[in-house]
Amino acid sequence: MNQSLLAPYGNAIERVNAALTALRQGKGVLVVDDEDRENEGDLIYSAETLTNEQMALLIRECSGIVCLCLTDERIEQLQLPPMVSDNNSQYGTAFTVSIEAKQGVTTGVSAADRVTTIKTAIADNAKPDDLARPGHVYPLRARPGGVLERRGHTEGTVDLMKLAGLKPYGVLCEVTLVDGTMARLPEIIEFGQQHDMPVLTIEDIVAYRTTQ
């Protein structure tokens, strides 16, 4: 990772602390993974504080595949099976079946409908029957060990929510450029400056968890 581009945001610990502060304030953060992995940047929000306006930004500025990062416990509570029985995707991203709230939505596609689905899925008393399958929100199952077990955006998202003292559920989507290609670190930093969002890396979260 090009640390010189990240230098204005401080060191790894300072970058994580800035992200935790932003999340506690209901703001978004931008997380970039390793250059030798996906080398992509994701816009991440707390599922707990997510607003319709934030969802609209995710849909407008990102890939459109809005994912809900969940813990093992929540996946089991909702009885969400894996999307496929044999996951042979390059990075083992643990998609479950997609979901839709049964109540309070129309087609499920709008920003408001997707937020309703997410809030339904993370409610304390959520039940499997609260959700229809398939739908327009894509749950991801985070590994229990977080980024120390798998250096992915899914685990980084759940780790950040836990460290921020929020419900351990987050929403992510990959940032894309106008031409549809994926945004890399320089573009992610520019996006963060435009939207007043902190930028950090999966490597930063690993460093934070191993030193704090």
From Swiss-Prot:
Organism of derivation: Shewanella halifaxensis (strain HAW-EB4)
Note on how the cofactor is bound: Binds 2 divalent metal cations per subunit. Magnesium or manganese.
Signal peptide: none
EC class: lyase
Entries under Gene3D superfamilies matching the protein: DHBP synthase (3.90.870.10)
Reaction equations catalysed: D-ribulose 5-phosphate = (2S)-2-hydroxy-3-oxobutyl phosphate + formate + H(+)
Gene this chain is encoded by: ribB
Name of protein: 3,4-dihydroxy-2-butanone 4-phosphate synthase
Transmembrane segments: none
Amino acids binding Mg(2+) 1: E38
Record family assignment: Belongs to the DHBP synthase family.
UniProt-listed GO biological process terms: riboflavin biosynthetic process
